[in-house]
Amino acid sequence: MHQPPVLRVARHTDMHAIWQIDVNVFGEDVYPGFFFRQAMDLWPELLLVAELDGKLLGYALGGLGQDRSQGWLLSLAVLPEARGFGLAERMMLQVEQGLLALGIERVRLTVDPANPAQRLYFRLGYQQLAEERDYFGPGEDRLLLEKRLG
C-alpha cells in the first residue's frame, strides 16, 4: 500500500462488501447481512470502513450499551492482505472517538482467547474484566475487555 487507506463512515452501498469482509475474515461465524444495515440505522457514525482505490479493506462497528455510559466494539475485521498496516488500530481509535463524542465513558469488547488481536486491544489500554465460558454457545469462550475513554 503506497497511500494509506481512507477511513470513512459506511454508506448503504457498502453493505454487501462489509458482509463479504465478514465472511472472508470470520468464515461461518458472521453477522447476517441485514444486521449491518440495521446497525447503520442505529449507529450511523459508528460503522466505519477502510477504503483504498474503491475497495473496502476492513470495517469496525461500534454500538451503544443498555447502560448509556457504556459502548461496545461489536466487530472489527481487516482482510488478510491488508493486515500489518495499522488499519485495525486506526479504525478502533476512530470508533472510540465516535463513542466519546456521544458521551460514552467506557467501551467494551469480547474476543476469542486464542485471537491474536487481543494483543492490540491490551496495547490500546483495554483491561480484562472476565473470561466467560460458552459466551456464544458451547466451546465459544470469550474474554470480556473494557477501556475507559477520555
Map each language-model feature to its residues:
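Short glycine/proline-centered loop/turn elements that form peptide/ligand docking sites
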Residues: A88, M92, A114-A117, D134-G139
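Conserved catalytic-core motifs of GNAT/GCN5-like acyltransferases
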Residues: R108-T110, F122, Q127-L144
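Short amphipathic helical patch at the helix-1/turn junction of helix-turn-helix
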Residues: V78, V111-D112
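Residue-level recognition of strand-loop junctions within catalytic nucleotide-signaling folds
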Residues: D112, R148-G150
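Short phosphate-binding/catalytic loops that engage adenosine nucleotides
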Residues: V78, L87, I104, Y126
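Acetyl-CoA-dependent GNAT
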Residues: H2-P5, V9-R83, M92-Q94, G98, ...
